Regions:
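A short small-residue
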Residues: 1-2, 33-34, 102-110, 149-152
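Extreme N-terminal tail/first-helix region
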Residues: 1-17, 21
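Active-site oxyanion-binding pockets that recognize sulfate/phosphate
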Residues: 2-9, 41-44, 111-119, 155, ...
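Short amphipathic alpha-helical segments with heptad-repeat character
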Residues: 10-13, 17, 48, 52, ...
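Intrinsically disordered, low-complexity segments enriched in polar/charged residues with Gly/Pro
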Residues: 12-13, 20-21, 27-29, 151-153
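Acidic/histidine-rich alpha-helical segments that form the ligand environment
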Residues: 19, 25-28, 84-140
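Short, contiguous alpha-helical
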Residues: 34-89, 127, 131-135, 139-185
Length: 185
C-alpha cells in the first residue's frame, strides 16, 4: 500500500474521532449495561479495557518513535511493509465484519472488576492518540520503526503501527456497539 502521509493521518484522525464519539455515548449508560455480558463474550467495559491495555503499550511506543525520528526529513509518501500491511488489514473492519481472534492473556480483561473510570481512561488515550497522530505529520512513517506488543523481535513501519492500532480500536468499537444493541433487543 502506498499513500500520502497527510491522507493517511487524516483518515486515522477521522476514525479516532468517530471512536471517541461512540464511547462518549457509552458514558451515559448505567453501569449494569456497561458490565452486561452475553455468554462468554466481553462486556462494553471489557472491550474498552482491552483497548486501554493495548494503548498502554502502543501510545508510549509511538511517542518514543516520534521523538527518535523527529530530526529526520519526513517523506510525503508512506509505503506499507509486507508484515505491517498484513497485520493492519487483519484488524480493519470490512463491510461491518470483523475477523474473530483470540486475545493474548495479558490483554484479556475478562472478569476484571471494571468501573466507569475505564471509559475516562480510554477517552484520555484517544486524546493522546490524536496529539500523536498530528505529530506524525512531520515524521517519515516508512523509515521510522516501532516495536509491537506481541514480541520485541518484530518491528513495523510506524505508519503500519498507526493503522494497526487505530483499526484495532475501531473493531472493538463495533463489538461494543453490538453488545449495546443486544441489550436493547
Amino acid at each position: 500500500m502506498e499513500i500520502e502521509n497527510d491522507i493517511l493521518i487524516d483518515d486515522l484522525l477521522r476514525r479516532t474521532k468517530q471512536s471517541t464519539e461512540r464511547v462518549k455515548r457509552f458514558e451515559r449508560l448505567p453501569i449494569s449495561q456497561l458490565r452486561f455480558k452475553s455468554g462468554s463474550r466481553w462486556s462494553i467495559l471489557e472491550c474498552l479495557e482491552h483497548l486501554n491495555l493495548y494503548g498502554d503499550f502502543y501510545l508510549v511506543e509511538i511517542e518514543k518513535q516520534i521523538i527518535a525520528n523527529r530530526n529526520r526529513p519526513p517523506s510525503r509518501i508512506f509505503r506499507s511493509g509486507f508484515v505491517g500491511n498484513y497485520f493492519a488489514n487483519l484488524m480493519e473492519v470490512k463491510e461491518g465484519k470483523i475477523t474473530k481472534m483470540k486475545s493474548p492473556k495479558n490483554k484479556n480483561p475478562a472478569n476484571m472488576d471494571l468501573t466507569i473510570t475505564t471509559i475516562s481512561r480510554f477517552l484520555k488515550q484517544q486524546e493522546q492518540l490524536t496529539v500523536l497522530l498530528n505529530s506524525c505529520r512531520s515524521i517519515d512513517l516508512t523509515r521510522a520503526k516501532s516495536a509491537i506488543s506481541l514480541t520485541r523481535l518484530i518491528k513495523l513501519r510506524l505508519g503500519d503501527t498507526l493503522r494497526f492500532f487505530t483499526y484495532h480500536i475501531e473493531r472493538h468499537m463495533l463489538q461494543a456497539e453490538r453488545i449495546c444493541k443486544e441489550q436493547i433487543l
